[in-house]
A protein has these predicted regions:
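Terminal substrate-recognition subdomain of acyl/acetyltransferases
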Residues: 2-4, 157-173
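Conserved GNAT acetyl-CoA-binding A-motif
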Residues: 115, 122-134
């Protein structure tokens, strides 16, 4: 369970006025994998692309008090930087990108709680899967998602790095 003192609130769609705070959260979170020797999020995702995703309505966040505690980008189809043929199917899914929880909340199972909320929201919207990738050089992330019911769907090269594709079929535990 999450820490009972944490009030996670509801997922809120980001607006352009939220860009600075949410991008700061991404920057802060990107330092952790680098400190572990991973190349994930190095360099940090370009702010121009993130701003466009906010503008397109794909970025969401949760707040703790007045500050964002987590953010996620939910794409209705595979990211444009995936190689051709990767998840080119008709399975209705959210492609989970840049799922970030404030590092100061590590150990409180906030990410797990929010991921479960995403699963319920996706299933309630008629989607059949959550899909994501993790840089193979960051085995922590692969283990994290596998432990939460995601399946390894293979390895591909994305933006010059080997990445593991992971999928969580909804309604299956």
């Amino acid at each position: 369970m999450t820490d009972p003192d944490l009030e996670l609130g509801v997922r809120t769609q980001a607006l352009p006025r939220d860009l600075t705070d949410l991008y700061s959260l991404l920057q802060e979170a990107s330092a952790w994998p680098r400190a572990q020797g991973s190349t994930q999020w190095n360099p940090v995702y370009p702010i121009e692309r993130f701003a466009q995703e906010v503008e397109d309505g794909h970025v969401w966040y949760w707040k703790l008090g007045t500050a964002p505690l987590a953010t996620v980008t939910l794409l209705p189809r595979r990211p444009d930087y995936y190689p051709a043929g990767v998840w080119d199917d008709d399975v209705p899914a959210w492609h989970v990108c840049r799922f970030t929880v404030k590092r100061t909340l590590a150990g409180h199972r906030v990410g797990e709680t929010l991921l479960r909320q995403l699963e319920l929201d996706a299933a309630g919207s008629g989607l059949q899967a959550l899909r994501l990738d993790a840089v193979a050089a960051n085995p922590f992330l692969e283990r994290y998602y596998l432990a939460r019911g995601f399946e390894d769907c293979g390895t591909v090269e994305i933006r010059g790095e080997r990445s593991v594709l992971l999928e969580r079929r909804l309604g299956v535990r």
